[in-house]
Amino acid sequence: MQGPGGNVSRGLPSGPASTVASGAGRCESGALMHSFGIFLQGLLGVVAFSTLMLKRFREPKHERRPWRIWFLDTSKQAIGMLFIHFANVYLADLTEEDPCSLYLINFLLDATVGMLLIYVGVRAVGVLVEWQQWESLRFGEYGDPLQCGAWVGQCALYIVIMIFEKSVVFIVLLILQWKKVALLNPIENPDLKLAIVMLIVPFFVNAFMFWVVDNFLMRKGKTKAKLEERGANQDSRNGSKVRYRRAASHEESESEILISADDEMEESDAEEDLRRPVKKKHRFGLPV
């Protein structure tokens, strides 16, 4: 009787001990949405989004966007990034592997392959919008006065681009079997794994992604060449020549200001009238 009793006493702790050992240092399924994980995600969102505010203040004063335009531009990107983030969290919990490692791999693929896909998508949409002359769907242009419908349409287009990007990245993840890669296995502390996956690595990568994607989505200033071409086409009918000057301040509505040939001739005539009395005084030896 002692034998069976001893066997039972030795067998009872062995099960729980092995369970604890197998789970030690592992990022369990659902850990990304636990309280600590949610706290890290919120902190990351605030810190990473603040880089867009820094970018705005670093823009030249005559090109700096008003706060309302800046908010409309960046809110589209924030919605797109939230979609990618929660898609990664959902996909990470679909596997029996370490969800923290799979989330990190997903995130790094979004920051490399995904960035290229976003750029291609934005350019393709831009070409389509120009071809169809959909004025309200040009990224960064919301009409004057601002139209909420323009923002909604652009936001919908950007979400379609993000769905395309995430679908391609997910296919790449499945084909290359990267879901079996355990990048964080050497780290034993699960909270440290969460901090690396949700805060440390994403902070630097998200700051770079926000900065670059904002350049994709913001309204580009009209170039001098485009304005000259447009002005030449307009004024060729009138037979007049035009020239352009750079805007001296942000208050002027366009970064390139058209000056008509008539205005330039009036300025030159006024200067010539001022020089004539001076020339006559020099001719007769009178003091100027």
Swiss-Prot record:
* Locus of motif GXXXG motif: 149-153
Q: Name one GO biological process term.
A: store-operated calcium entry
- Which ranges are annotated Basic residues under compositional bias? 277-288
Q: Where is this region: Disordered?
A: 228-288
A GO MF annotation of the entry reads: calcium channel regulator activity
Cytoplasmic face: residue ranges?
Answer: 1-28, 215-288
Acidic residues composition bias: residue spans:
261-272
The record, for Pfam families, names: STIMATE (PF12400)
Q: Does the keyword Endoplasmic reticulum apply?
A: yes
* Membrane topology field: Multi-pass membrane protein
Instruction: Please verify whether the record's keywords include Nucleotide-binding.
Output: no
Q: Which segments cross the bilayer?
A: 29-49, 69-89, 102-122, 156-176, 194-214
Q: Where in the cell is it found?
A: Endoplasmic reticulum membrane
Tissue distribution: Widely expressed.
- Annotated region (Required for localization in the endoplasmic reticulum) at 241-246
* Record's keyword terms, sorted: Endoplasmic reticulum, Membrane, Transmembrane, Transmembrane helix
Q: Which GO terms describe its cellular component?
A: cortical endoplasmic reticulum; endoplasmic reticulum membrane; endoplasmic reticulum-plasma membrane contact site
Domain writeup? The GXXXG motif may mediate oligomerization. The C-terminus is necessary for its localization at ER-plasma membrane (ER-PM) junctions as well as for the store-dependent rearrangement of ER-PM junctions.
The UniProt subunit note reads as follows: Homooligomer. Interacts with STIM1.
Q: What does this protein do?
A: Acts as a regulator of store-operated Ca(2+) entry (SOCE) at junctional sites that connect the endoplasmic reticulum (ER) and plasma membrane (PM), called ER-plasma membrane (ER-PM) junction or cortical ER. SOCE is a Ca(2+) influx following depletion of intracellular Ca(2+) stores. Acts by interacting with STIM1, promoting STIM1 conformational switch. Involved in STIM1 relocalization to ER-PM junctions. Contributes to the maintenance and reorganization of store-dependent ER-PM junctions.
The text of the family note is:
Belongs to the STIMATE family.
What's the protein name? Store-operated calcium entry regulator STIMATE
User: What organism does the UniProt record list as the source?
Assistant: Mus musculus
Its ancestry begins with: Eukaryota, Metazoa, Chordata, Craniata, Vertebrata
Q: Which gene encodes it?
A: Stimate
